[in-house]
């Protein structure tokens, strides 16, 4: 039976069904348990990073090689014809589509991945981040990590802490978890960085429970997942940043009343919003989360490039 992800563009989380998300999570678990080095043998994947990336690019390229594919591409968009000779993104994509079986693309411009998908001649485009818009494969590894640690994706209490206004990871993960049953969200942020209205309106329309908070200490005892994010210094003046930052620092002491199954996640890099003493607690899972990016991306690539997987 053909899987619904075969040759599908992976541009945004809302375009993926619950069944597709579950298939990716299940396949990631299988590949973590039993590696398969020939899943995309003889397939060539373009890794096109028009802005700097460390974890995402290395994770994708590792995933491609571990399941038997070959990688071509670049990690510095400034040295491409697009930048140096004025070539349009659409022209670049049309040319590269002649060489490869799939695109992985990160670009600073919102909507760039969708534009690429319109000019790729049917070659599937996987969005590795387009500006502040979407980062769907981060969400896939987050879902896999939550499933791995909680043994479920339904019936969860999940808190997001920090920059909820600009953080594309929290927007995408909220949209993904909203497809599951009995999810209760806790959004913890200063008013200036609160979750955007469009996300809250979607939750209201779907009848999904959420609450807004400015203090995380009071919600920690209720949580299964605590998802921390960095408060971005560049968005505040010095005194305002110092005040906001100090309110959203997770320490080991704050976790003393947490549920035994609570896991702390973070898309990384962290600055000082999680103190290093948290690393030694059984709740810390952000480094394993980053490692899971390889398996989630292996699963996605395998499904996009195999008709009957």
From Swiss-Prot:
Keywords, alphabetical: Pyrimidine biosynthesis, Transferase
Catalytic function, reaction form: carbamoyl phosphate + L-aspartate = N-carbamoyl-L-aspartate + phosphate + H(+)
GO molecular function, one term: amino acid binding
One GO cellular component term noted in the UniProt record for this chain: cytosol
Pathway it works in: Pyrimidine metabolism; UMP biosynthesis via de novo pathway; (S)-dihydroorotate from bicarbonate: step 2/3
Tagged with keyword Transit peptide: no
Protein family: Belongs to the aspartate/ornithine carbamoyltransferase superfamily. ATCase family.
UniProt-recorded name of the protein: Aspartate carbamoyltransferase catalytic subunit
Encoding gene (name): pyrB
């Amino acid at each position: 039976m053909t899987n619904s992800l075969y040759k599908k563009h992976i541009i945004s989380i809302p375009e993926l069904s619950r069944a597709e998300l579950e298939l990716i999570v299940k396949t990631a678990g299988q590949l973590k348990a039993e590696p398969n080095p020939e899943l995309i043998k003889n397939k060539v994947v373009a890794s096109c990073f028009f802005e700097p990336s460390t974890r995402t690019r290395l994770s994708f390229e590792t995933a491609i090689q571990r399941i038997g594919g070959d990688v071509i591409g670049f990690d510095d968009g400034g040295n491409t014809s697009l930048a140096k000779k004025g070539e349009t993104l659409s022209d670049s994509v049309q040319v590269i589509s002649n060489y490869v079986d799939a695109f992985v693309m990160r670009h600073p411009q919102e909507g760039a991945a969708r534009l690429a998908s319109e000019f790729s001649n049917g070659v599937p485009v996987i969005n590795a981040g387009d500006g502040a818009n979407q980062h769907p494969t981060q969400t896939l590894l987050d879902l896999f990590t939550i499933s791995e640690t909680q043994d479920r994706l339904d019936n969860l209490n999940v808190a997001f802490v920090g920059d909820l206004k600009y953080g594309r990871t929290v927007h995408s993960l909220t949209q993904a978890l909203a497809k599951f049953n009995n999810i209760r969200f806790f959004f913890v942020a200063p008013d200036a960085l609160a979750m955007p209205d469009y996300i809250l309106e979607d939750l209201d329309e779907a009848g999904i429970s959420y609450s807004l908070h400015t203090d995380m200490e009071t919600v920690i005892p209720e949580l299964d997942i605590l998802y921390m994010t960095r408060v971005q210094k560049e968005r505040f003046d010095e005194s305002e940043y110092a005040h906001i930052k100090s309110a959203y620092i997770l320490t080991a002491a704050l976790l003393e009343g947490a549920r035994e199954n609570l896991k702390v996640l973070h898309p990384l890099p962290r600055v000082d919003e999680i103190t290093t003493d948290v690393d030694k607690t059984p709740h810390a899972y952000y480094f394993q989360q980053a490692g899971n990016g390889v398996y989630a991306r292996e699963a996605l690539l395998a499904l996009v490039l195999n008709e009957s997987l």
